[in-house]
């Protein structure tokens, strides 16, 4: 059952440019159903809704291409898939669901989806999409820990360690290189809004995650 806070439909103001570009509300509901799959604990409709909400509250409106990319960026999520595979399949799904829409917009949206695999912006349009995708890194510490446990829950069946505490420690250690890679960048976030609102708390969370081994998750 979805949380009331996960409600996302064609009435959301951030989706208006996408719908005005010809993406049908019925197709929108079909895509959103992918985010309700039972194996998802983090990459779900709540995550998606938060990103669209943030584009409104931060005053950084999405254009149709960016909205399309956000909508599809985690549409396919198979835990344990090789890096980039989920994003590539999500981009392929995007093409299936956008037959008849402007070709250049679809091509650009697919490129943005693929950029989310490495979180490297290869165009200016990608910058806002990537910032919104990484916004949870800047959550309050207890929320950051909760999100980390949600990702762990999605990966748990792939970790051949019976003890949950040991499995969590192993999972945490596997995330360190990615977190360090983000910290080594001059900026974690690309846009002025992302740097203003997310940069400092995200770096604090990432340093904490890397500095404590095994990672001491909060109870919140």
Language-model features: locations:
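Amphipathic alpha-helical interaction segments
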Residues: 58, 78-82, 101, 120
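Alpha-helix N-cap and coil->helix boundary residues
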Residues: 26, 62-65, 85, 104-108, ...
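His-Asp-centered metal-binding catalytic motifs of divalent-metal-dependent phosphohydrolases/nucleases
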Residues: 51, 63-80, 90, 110-117
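Divalent metal-dependent phosphate-bond-processing catalytic cores, especially two-metal-ion Mg2+/Mn2+ enzymes
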Residues: 2-3, 11-14, 36-43, 53-62, ...
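Hydrophobic, proline/glycine-rich low-complexity stretches
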Residues: 2-29
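Short, well-structured alpha-helical segments
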Residues: 25-32, 45, 49, 67, ...
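Hydrophobic/basic alpha-helical segments enriched in Actinobacteria
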Residues: 17-24, 56-58, 96-97
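An active-site-proximal "capping" alpha-helix that borders the catalytic cofactor pocket
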Residues: 51, 85-100
């Amino acid at each position: 059952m979805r949380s009331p806070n996960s409600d996302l439909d064609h009435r959301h103001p951030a989706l208006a440019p996408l719908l005005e570009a010809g993406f049908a509300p019925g197709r929108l509901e079909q895509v959103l159903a992918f985010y309700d799959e039972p194996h998802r604990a983090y990459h779900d409709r709540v995550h998606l809704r938060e990103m669209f909400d943030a584009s409104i509250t931060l005053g950084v409106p999405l254009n149709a291409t960016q909205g399309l990319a956000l909508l599809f960026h985690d549409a396919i999520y198979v835990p344990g898939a090789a890096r980039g595979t989920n994003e590539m399949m999500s981009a392929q799904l995007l093409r299936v669901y956008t037959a008849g829409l402007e070709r250049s917009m679809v091509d650009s949206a697919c490129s943005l989806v693929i950029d989310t695999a490495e979180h490297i912006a290869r165009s200016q349009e990608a910058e806002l999409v990537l910032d919104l995708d990484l916004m949870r890194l800047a959550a309050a510490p207890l929320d950051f820990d909760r999100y980390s446990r949600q990702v762990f829950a999605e990966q748990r069946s792939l970790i051949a360690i019976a003890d949950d505490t040991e499995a969590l420690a192993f999972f945490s250690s596997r995330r360190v290189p990615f977190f360090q890679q983000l910290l080594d960048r001059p900026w974690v976030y690309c846009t002025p809004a992302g740097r203003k609102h997310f940069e400092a708390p995200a770096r604090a969370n990432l340093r904490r995650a890397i500095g404590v081994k095994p990672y001491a998750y909060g109870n919140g």
